[in-house]
UniProtKB/Swiss-Prot annotation:
Extent of Basic and acidic residues compositional bias: 8-22
Region annotation (Disordered) ranges: 1-22
Species per Swiss-Prot/TrEMBL record: Culex quinquefasciatus
InterPro entries: DUF4519
Protein name: Single-pass membrane and coiled-coil domain-containing protein 4 homolog
GO CC annotation terms, alphabetical: membrane
UniProt-listed PANTHER family: SINGLE-PASS MEMBRANE AND COILED-COIL DOMAIN-CONTAINING PROTEIN 4
Keywords associated with the record: Coiled coil, Membrane, Transmembrane, Transmembrane helix
Length: 60
């Protein structure tokens, strides 16, 4: 059993299970929300740099 912060009481099985479920939920949100957003931001930065650094041909 794990000691909770600031007290002598210990975690019950139910509390431990709830904590594990909460951690799994956070990991799932990381995969479904945070990583795609980071990917989109990265692609936007790459596209911006590409468009700003490509050679331009001026017609006479």
């Amino acid at each position: 059993m794990r000691k909770l912060r600031g007290g002598q009481t210990r975690e019950t099985r139910k509390q431990k299970q709830e904590r594990r479920e909460e951690n799994q939920k956070i990991q799932q949100q990381l995969k479904t929300i945070v990583l795609p957003i980071c990917g989109v931001v990265f692609l936007c930065i790459v596209a911006y740099v590409f468009l700003k650094t490509r050679p331009r041909f001026e017609e006479l």
